[in-house]
Every structure is written in C-alpha cells, then in structure tokens.
C-alpha cells in the first residue's frame, strides 16, 4: 500500500525514532508499504518517519555504482532495522541530495565517503555492510531521518539562500494539511 508522505514541517520528521523491539507482521507490512511508497515517488531510500511512523527502520533500493557512476538497483528492497553506523570515513565528499519529504529542492551536502552499517533484517538476522559512494550517502541520509535530522540541516548554504528558505516555507504551507503527529 502506498502511504502518504510526511513533508517538511511535520513534527514526526524531527523526532528521534524508537528502536524496534520485535519484528511483527505490522513491521513487515510497514517495510513493504515503505518500499511501494518509495518506488511510487521515484525515491532510492525512505525512512519510517517519512510515512508518519517514528520507528527505527528504513528501506533502500541501491546496491552500488558502476565505474561510470550509474546506479545498480536491487532486485528486492534492502530493509535496515535499528541501524548503527561505524567506521565512518574521515574523507568527506560533496554531493547533491534531495528528499521525498522536501519535494523539488536539492542541495549540496558533505558526507563521509564510506561507512559500515550494522542492522537487523525482516527475518531478525543481524547483518553488517561496508558501503561507499552513493549507497553510503543514502544510508547516512536515511539514518539521519531516524534521528530527526534532515539534509537541509547539513547542507552547504545555497548561493541564493533566501530563495531556498522561501521554497522551504512554501513546502511547509502547501503540505500543512498533511501534517500528522502520531505521538500526540
């Protein structure tokens, strides 16, 4: 099922997600719904807070990059439950980022070149991955969502910052009727 997205201005996007203690049918369905929502909106990753669920889970559909920089997409979504990042590279790389919760805007963000992520899959199995390049950027971006952080909090200031801030305010106003606060 495609779920409604939370947009910039939603309190859910600024809340630290809660750890998932048990993988239930509801969690499995949430992951499936998130994947369908991500694909429907042409995303490459999606965190649970972006669909109004403040739990520590995100999905991603990129496995890597070719030498030419083309993305290699997964046959099945990767699900990360209660992710923990480590071995964060000191080498920072500037890259453009966007977000389904901030439609139409992109900005440059410095992120580490590589990371290691340890998480749990839908079968309850712990796994560890070392990621570099764009897949690492996606994991860091989605993991930030689980901590109430948006890419705009880390972006390099755009050349026309006033215009960017104005666009953010338009997003907040436009999607205000979609804002939910499920913790209230």
Curated annotation (Swiss-Prot):
Keyword set, alphabetical order: Hydrolase, Iron, Metal-binding, Protein biosynthesis
SUPFAM superfamilies: Peptide deformylase
EC number in record: 3.5.1.88
Catalytic activity of the protein: N-terminal N-formyl-L-methionyl-[peptide] + H2O = N-terminal L-methionyl-[peptide] + formate
Keyword flag Aminoacyl-tRNA synthetase: no
Manner of cofactor binding, per the entry note: Binds 1 Fe(2+) ion.
Residues annotated as binding Fe cation: 99, 141, 145
PANTHER family membership: PEPTIDE DEFORMYLASE (PTHR10458:SF22)
NCBIfam families reported in the protein's UniProt record: pept_deformyl (TIGR00079), PRK00150.1-3 (NF001159)
Role, per record: Removes the formyl group from the N-terminal Met of newly synthesized proteins. Requires at least a dipeptide for an efficient rate of reaction. N-terminal L-methionine is a prerequisite for activity but the enzyme has broad specificity at other positions.
Name this protein carries in UniProt: Peptide deformylase
Gene giving rise to this polypeptide: def
């Amino acid at each position: 099922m495609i779920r409604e997205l939370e947009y910039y201005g939603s309190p859910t996007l600024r809340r630290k997600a809660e750890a998932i203690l048990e993988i239930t049918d509801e969690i499995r369905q949430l992951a499936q719904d998130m994947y369908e929502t991500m694909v429907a909106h042409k995303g490459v990753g999606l965190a649970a807070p972006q669909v109004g669920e403040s739990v520590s889970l995100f999905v991603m559909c990129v496995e890597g990059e070719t030498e030419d920089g083309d993305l290699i997409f997964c046959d099945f979504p990767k699900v990360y439950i209660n992710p923990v990042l480590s071995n964060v590279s000191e080498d920072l790389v500037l890259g453009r980022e966007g977000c389904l919760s901030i439609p139409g805007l992109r900005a440059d963000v410095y992120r580490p070149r590589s990371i290691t992520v340890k998480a749990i899959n839908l079968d309850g199995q712990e796994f560890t991955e070392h990621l570099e390049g764009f897949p690492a950027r996606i994991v860091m971006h989605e993991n930030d969502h689980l901590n109430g952080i948006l890419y705009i909090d880390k972006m390099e200031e755009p050349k026309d910052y006033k215009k960017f801030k104005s666009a953010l305010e338009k997003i907040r106003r436009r999607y205000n009727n979609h804002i939910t606060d499920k913790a209230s």
